[in-house]
Design a protein with these regions (language model features):
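Active-site-proximal, substrate-binding regions of enzyme catalytic domains
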Residues: 1-94, 100, 104-111
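Flexible glycine-rich active-site/ligand-binding loops centered on an Asp-His dyad
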Residues: 113-116
């Protein structure tokens, strides 16, 4: 199963010390570079940064379709745009994204998006 995640599902679980649940449920999770950068930004907080740095099951992957990212950027932020584009590229089984506009953009592209 191929899973791609946006920033919020990872950071929210990391903040409450439950990031390992993602690994238990999904195994490996792909994240685009923009999401990785957001997770390691000092604004994310030390708890999130430390959890992400030790989560060896998170795989960072570059998005190739920059045109799709640019198109999505008219609707969502860069992390969401890259996560959606990566999910399209790798034909992900599921995209974990909790922002409503991001879920709608993903659904419009035929992706199975989940998160609330």
């Amino acid at each position: 199963m191929v899973i791609v995640s946006n920033t919020s599902p990872i950071s929210n679980l990391a903040k409450v010390g439950q990031l390992s649940l993602m690994q238990q449920i999904y195994g490996r999770i792909l994240i685009p570079c923009a999401v990785h950068e957001e997770l390691l930004d000092e604004r994310a907080g030390e708890t999130v940064i430390t959890a992400v740095q030790s989560a060896t099951w998170l795989e960072i992957q570059s998005v190739q379709n920059r045109e799709l990212v640019d198109e999505l950027r008219t609707r969502v932020n860069v992390g969401e745009a890259e996560a959606i584009a990566l999910a399209v590229e790798v034909e992900a089984n599921r995209l974990l994204i909790d922002e409503q506009l991001g879920r709608q953009a993903a659904t419009d592209l035929g992706l199975n998006a989940s998160g609330e």
